[in-house]
Amino acid sequence: MELGLERIFSAHQALLQSAYESTIVHVAGSNGKGTLCATLAVHLNHLGKSTVMFTSPHLVRVEERIRINGRPIDVQAFDQCLLQIRSIELELGLKLTFFEITFLVACLTAHREQASFFIVETGLGGRYDATRILPADAAVITSLSLEHRDILGDTLAEISAEKAAIARPGKPLIVRQIHDETAISAIEFEATNAGISALGEAFGPADLNWIEIPDGATFQQEALLLAKGVFAWFNLNTDDLQASVRSLRWPG
């Protein structure tokens, strides 16, 4: 696996010549990422906000990775994006990965749709994940555990640092409270020293917000509490959040 953001950053810059109209929410974590993304999207739709959501993997069709207001992108629109991306690959002499290509389809879709919110799930880690190139307005971290140790590190602190590197200067970093002191310190360090200069970001602190979640909470219970933290930041009403979630059908 290749680590680094230069290739995807170059392709993204070439494809999208203007800024996003969307508020971008970036979600990382070991488990529960997709559930949180779906919870955010369904309530935003309930509030009358348009959404584009990018998650992975898909269960049946690749188009499931990109959802417009909860529905997978249609095949024709997906294929049209592929043609644009292939043109950029040839122009810049790049060979993008499957994940990078599907992510760029989501970016093109959010940009074209001028969605109110673009909700994006990381693929692996955070610091070097392709999705890190986005100018996110909020970052969220779900539960953390030892995973992908060959890539992210051998300890919970190392893994936590890689995921917390999605923090953006001056923006909220909303994190499920953990009780490992070394992991807490790693997250606090990344939040204090947020920003990647190669992406044009200035260095500075993120606004770290810990969300207490009971032990044994299900992914949906976790998602509800984290979603409330996100919506509070954007001053969005959560009175009907439970009702929104009851209409959600999220496989996996």
Regions flagged by a language model, labelled:
Residues 23-27, 35-52:
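A conserved segment at the C-terminal end of the G1
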Residues 52, 251-252:
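A short linear hydrophobic-aromatic micro-motif
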Residues 5, 9-21, 46-134, 150-153, ...:
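ATP-dependent carboxylate-amine ligase catalytic core
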